[in-house]
A protein has these predicted regions:
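Active-site signature of cysteine proteases
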Residues: 1-207
Length: 207
């Protein structure tokens, strides 16, 4: 990975990693990482065994519906959300600017260009796909809003890092429109401001 970065320039000013953090005025204690799995108790923190969690960070576990509801609650209240997700599915496409989970194998051929029914993702199926390594922690992105298609289906507007120009083989200015079923199945976790959590979740977690 190379040498540690000790100094860099941002908008014409030099920073160290520490001075840049101070400039942002972010208090890292204001944030929590939430997730949803069935192999650990709900509303407890635990260390998730994934390669990217090399620092042994804690995750708060909760039911799948509540996990998604907290993403919505954050966005509806003006907060954005950091996302850790699996992007290895053939139906995650930066080129097409969408990430979806088709209800049938046949629809995989056309779902990137046509609106098709999507899979009903249960907690049990999510857990199964994680345990058999079909879901892995591939990529970090940034959920900044929601959009709706012609049939009224909601998608999360996800800022990706694969470029923003059409010549870079991306669509939607580099954003990916990620369906709710995709998030239910393939979102490993999200980092969210404590103030953006739903009141019930705050109480259950004691934060």
């Amino acid at each position: 990975m190379g040498k540690d970065v000790t100094e860099f320039t941002y908008e014409g000013k030099k920073y160290t990693p520490q001075s840049f953090l101070e400039m942002t005025k972010l208090n890292l204690n204001d944030y929590v990482t939430i997730t949803s799995f069935t192999h650990v108790p709900f509303y407890k923190s635990f260390i998730l065994d994934i390669p990217d969690n090399f620092s042994y960070g804690n995750f708060y576990n909760m039911p799948l519906d509540e996990f998604v509801q907290n993403i919505d609650n954050a966005l509806d209240n003006g907060y954005t959300v950091a996302l850790d997700a699996d992007v290895s599915e053939s139906t995650f496409s930066g080129k097409n600017g969408v990430a979806v989970i088709p209800a049938s194998a046949e629809d995989k051929k056309t779902i990137l260009s046509e609106i098709k029914p999507e899979l009903k993702v249960t907690p049990e199926f999510r857990q199964q796909e994680f345990e058999n390594f079909n879901t892995t922690d591939d990529h970090l992105m940034h959920i900044v809003g929601k959009v709706k298609d012609q049939k009224g289906n909601f998608y999360y507007k996800v800022k990706n890092s694969w470029g923003s120009e059409s010549g870079q083989n991306v669509s939607n200015g580099g954003f990916v429109y990620m369906s709710v079923p995709y998030v239910r199945l393939k979102a490993i976790s999200v980092l969210v401001n404590k103030k953006a959590l739903a009141p019930k979740t705050k109480k259950s977690l004691g934060v």
